[in-house]
From Swiss-Prot:
GO terms for biological process: carbon fixation; leaf development; photosynthesis; tricarboxylic acid cycle. It is an enzyme of class 4 (lyase). Its cofactor is Mg(2+). This is Phosphoenolpyruvate carboxylase. Homotetramer. The modification Phosphoserine is found at S11. It comes from Phaseolus vulgaris (Kidney bean). The keyword Cytoplasm applies.
Length: 968
């Protein structure tokens, strides 16, 4: 590195202050946090790899910071020259360093948000740092409803205790950070929070600083790259770890805060322990849509594993409860039951397994006697599940275990009633109430597993059956004939098929899945979701297959409408379904419908998908009301804006009126799980946001759009869809350009999910899953699926009548939450974007004849951004959100570095003849440092590319995902 660069180089701290020159508020410590973490990291980097390599990292950081200041493309070339001169080992170290920096920046950001939140609460100020755009506090919401909107406290309480939010954790392959690193990140976050506590002593500070450095080094020394793809069982275990670490204790803690908030508006009751405020479901091990790795055996395994984990978590708490409930006074009901348990118990059977209360509990401790029996049965429940999981059988009789939640709750409720009857309500409302709330929330399996399968797979099974019965081909029948036959069979009792049914592997897989559902306890399962559902027969087919496979407690069947045409046809399909008497009797006045944000966005673009999802919900609710059915909408949202992501509070409050009505299901996917539940305070905040926003939407619904707004949206949606499809599906150059200009083809090397990136191995954009589609554009910071179509729609309506239509669009933005949220999220994406990165990728990776096409797309990007600001009435991006603007400025430099790293690495991978000017190894200050860089190359001995290239590429992908705070 040139001496003059060394001389003029400022510290990282100074660089950060140059990027974000002023504090946003008095309690703004983000730059301080960032600088501390980066300074500690650079010291570690120097110790491990030498001073020269540290200075190279600083030089690269400075070049990218200079680029961010003036956006001069020449700086990107200078950056590329430095990056391509590195040898294989150094290249991995530098890419890994910037990826690590972005993870540290995320942690600093989380600590700052948490700190500001605590400071606001101490002052009694509930205003959120994002102008209330991402927050929804339960106490603030209750006070607003009662004191501003004049709702009665009882009315609010009744609505709250009857509402349900079901959070569905999915294993979508967007969590690019390994669990090993997530745990280290949590410890770094914890150290950073404590370091800035007001009451910290000098000794504490020194020890915390040492711990911080230790964890930063441990994270940097951990291989970021998964060397093998996770299995569905791995994904399920990773998902379950959040329950163990935060959610399990987070739920009762949150419900206590709800009790306090209710008390503050004059309600002296607690939320009933069995009120279904928060529920949890999962797709991990149940989502077989396009994932051949999710087999019936996998589904069985994850159900048994969840049951074993649940029993173990209850078991670990029951002795604490036995210590707490040492009272001798009880009511007659409990006394009779305790005496009966005492007489019949044989403590010697399981006493050897216990550390505490291993002798028979005397009758003068009746609560302990009753809870002792609960402990015995929990132990047997856990062990039976463990045996079934490992051996397929168990010697423990099922009657010795808990088989239903009601059975589990019975002795606990008995203890609660007795304590209240004896004047000990304060004790009853302690740990026992928390335990009751956990049992009511988590049941015997922590989560209920949804099953998801493509509608065509059910059609194939029924086609095989009808052909075997020699009554024709189900596949070739009309919808009317299918319905007639299905209803005839559902009304009859004859079995449709026996062991002689010819079965392909695919047909056996579908039927065996139903057999697993029949075999396992019903409380293991939630919904059966049919993807690519288009007609009533899709739903009736699943009902018939459940009956034929002897499912005694049939799962509720949920059609999933994803593509634009399916969303448009969904209300009519639902009306036809509700017109079927058999089905209407079967559902008992309740229906769930899932709407997909990802595929609708890929099919038509974000603008048209958002509007069609809005209209479809309105129409579906109208249909349900007409037939007297309570409808629950299940929102299949991803983390990125292109897949329906965005702040929770706003996403809920911008839904159409009457579409939530106290009942909401929503997916929590991939990296969003960590963002929602990675820490106790994040978990608490997530539960608050969902609960408060759902309550507010029901009791203070958003306005309905004016007829002229609807007409404007309809007009713009047609234009936006045409623009989007004309480029993505009809432009002959697009597929080639997309695959050359982005790392889409290399996405699978990240090993971040168990399912393939495509539904079918060949084909174009339509066969590509939504996640890699969004991932590829997020990596290049061009975000095409999010904004494409907006510009054309705005331009056409403004060209028609600029003054009138601009006035109407601005009125829509200022008065209609849905429209404002839609535009604000696109504005946020523009704040993260940089078309010059796309131009660099084009120059390096795209054939020259496609360069004009890339220029055309970038012109559309700039025009769309300009029109969006005009409609929003903003002079510059994020002018109304200084906090987000500051956070993005601080992370842009390392992201840009990784963008350039990625472009040049892709060039070297795709063009082996590409020549680079290499310089001597940098990390040579000591033999040990040199050796450690070489060892990084050895982590991937089977790569088909030149040493170090594949790992460098994957590290850039992971780092950019961390920096953008989204993968796909």
């Amino acid at each position: 590195m040139a001496n003059r660069n060394l001389e003029k180089m400022a510290s990282i701290d100074a660089q950060l202050r140059q990027l974000a020159p002023s504090k946003v508020s008095e309690d703004d410590k983000l730059i301080e946090y960032d600088a501390l973490l980066l300074d500690r990291f650079l010291d570690i980097l120097q110790n491990l790899h030498g001073e020269d390599l540290k200075e190279t990292v600083q030089e690269v950081y400075e070049l990218s910071a200079e680029y961010e200041g003036k956006h001069d493309p020449k700086k990107l070339e200078e950056l590329g020259n430095v990056i391509t001169s590195l040898d294989a080992g150094d290249s991995i170290v530098v890419a890994k360093s910037f990826s690590h920096m972005l993870n540290l920046a995320n942690l600093a950001e989380e600590v700052q948000i948490s700190r500001r939140r605590r400071n606001k609460l101490k002052k009694g100020d509930f205003a959120d740092e994002n102008n209330a755009t991402t927050e929804s506090d339960i106490e603030e919401t209750l006070k607003k409803l009662v004191f501003e909107l004049k709702k009665s406290p009882q009315e609010v309480f009744d609505a709250l205790k009857n509402q349900t939010v079901d959070l569905v954790l999915t294993a979508h392959p967007t969590q690019s950070v390994r669990r090993s690193l997530l745990q280290k990140h949590a410890r770094i976050r914890n150290c950073l929070s404590k370091l800035y506590a007001k009451d910290i002593t000098p000794d504490d500070k020194q020890e915390l600083d040492e711990a911080l450095q230790r964890e930063i080094q441990a994270a940097f020394r951990t291989d970021e790259i998964r060397r093998t793809p996770p299995t569905p069982q791995d994904e399920m275990r990773a998902g379950m770890s959040y329950f163990h670490e935060t959610i399990w204790n987070g739920v009762p803690s949150f419900l206590r805060r709800v009790d306090t908030a209710l008390n503050n508006i004059g309600i002296k009751e607690r939320v009933p322990y069995n009120a279904p405020l928060i529920q949890f479901s999962s797709w991990m091990g149940g989502d077989r849509d396009g994932n051949p790795r999710v087999t019936p055996e996998v589904t069985r395994d994850v159900c048994l594993l969840a049951r074993m984990m649940a029993a173990n978590m209850y078991y670990s708490q029951i002795e604490d409860l036995m210590f707490e409930l040492s009272m001798w006074r009880c009511n007659d009901e409990l006394r009779v039951h305790a005496d009966e348990v005492h007489r019949s118990s044989n403590k010697d059977e399981v006493a050897k397994h216990y550390i505490e209360f291993w002798k028979k509990v005397p009758t003068n401790e009746p609560y302990r006697v009753v809870l002792g029996e609960v402990r015995d049965r929990l132990y047997q429940t856990r062990e039976r599940s463990r045996h079934l999981l490992s051996n397929g059988y168990s010697d423990i009789p099922e009657e010795n275990t808990f088989t239903s939640v009601e059975e589990f709750l019975q002795p606990l409720e008995l203890c609660y009633r007795s304590l209240c009857a004896c004047g000990d309500r304060a004790i009853a409302d302690g740990s026992l109430l928390d335990f009751l709330r956990q049992v009511s929330t988590f049941g015997l399996s922590i989560v209920r597993l949804d099953i998801r399968q493509e509608s065509d797979r059910h059609t194939d099974v029924l086609d095989a059956i009808t052909k075997h019965l020699e009554i024709g081909s189900y596949q070739e029948w009309s919808e009317e004939k299918r319905q007639e036959w299905l209803l005839s069979e559902l009304s009859g009792k004859r079995p449709l098929f026996g062991p002689d049914l010819p079965q392909t592997e695919e047909i056996r897989d579908v039927l065996d899945t139903f057999h697993v559902i029949a075999e396992l306890p019903p409380d293991n399962f939630g919904a059966y979701i049919i993807s690519m559902a288009t007609a009533p027969s899709d739903v009736l087919a699943v009902e018939l297959l459940q009956r034929e496979c002897h499912v005694k407690h049939p799962l509720r069947v949920v059609p999933l409408f994803e593509k634009l045409a399916d969303l448009e046809a969904a209300p009519a399909a639902l009306a036809r379904l509700f017109s079927v008497d058999w089905y209407k009797n079967r559902i008992d006045g309740k229906q769930e419908v899932m709407i997909g944000y990802s595929d609708s966005g890929k099919d038509a673009g974000r603008f048209s998908a958002a509007w069609q999802l809005y209209k479809a919900q309105e129409e579906l609710v109208k249909v349900a009301k007409k037939f007297g059915i309570k409808l629950t909408m299940f929102h299949g949202r991803g983390g990125t804006v292109g897949r329906g992501g965005g702040p929770t509070h706003l996403a809920i409050l911008s839904q159409p009126p009457d579409t939530i009505h106290g009942s909401l299901r929503v997916t929590v996917q991939g990296e969003v799980i960590e963002q929602c539940f990675g820490e106790q305070h994040l978990c608490f905040r997530t539960l608050q946001r969902f609960t408060a926003a759902t309550l507010e939407h029901g009791m203070n619904p958003p306005i309905s759009p004016k007829p002229e707004w609807r007409a404007m949206m309809d007009q713009m949606a047609v234009i936006a869809t045409e623009e989007y499809r004309s480029i993505v599906f009809k432009e002959p150059r697009f597929v080639e350009y997309f695959r050359l200009a982005t790392p889409e083809l290399e996405y699978g090397r990240m090993n971040i999910g168990s399912r393939p990136a495509k539904r079918r191995p060949s084909g174009g954009i339509e066969t590509l899953r939504a996640i890699p589609w969004i991932f590829a554009w997020t990596q290049t910071r061009f975000h095409l699926p999010v904004w494409l179509g907006f510009g054309a729609a705005f331009k056409q309506v403004l060209d028609k009548n600029a003054k009138k239509n601009l006035s109407m669009l601005q009125e829509m933005y200022n008065q209609w939450p849905f429209f404002r949220v839609t535009l604000d999220l696109v504005e946020m994406v523009f704040a993260k974007g940089d078309p010059k990165i796309g131009a660099l990728n084009d120059r390096l990776l795209v054939s020259k004849d496609l360069w004009p096409f890339g220029d055309q797309l970038r012109n559309k990007y700039e025009e769309t951004k300009k029109l969006l600001l005009q409609v929003a009435g903003h002079k510059e991006i994020l002018e109304g959100d200084p906090y987000l603007k500051q956070r993005l400025r601080l992370r842009h430099s390392p992201i840009t570095t990784l963008n350039v790293f990625q472009a040049y690495t892709l060039k070297r991978i795709r063009d082996p003849n590409y020549k680079v000017k290499a310089r001597p190894r940098i990390s040579k200050e000591s033999a040990e440092a040199s050796k450690s860089a070489d060892e990084l190359i050895k982590l991937n001995p089977t790569s088909e590319y030149a040493p170090g290239l594949e790992d460098t590429l994957i590290l850039t992908m992971k780092g950019i995902a961390a920096g953008m705070q989204n993968t796909g």
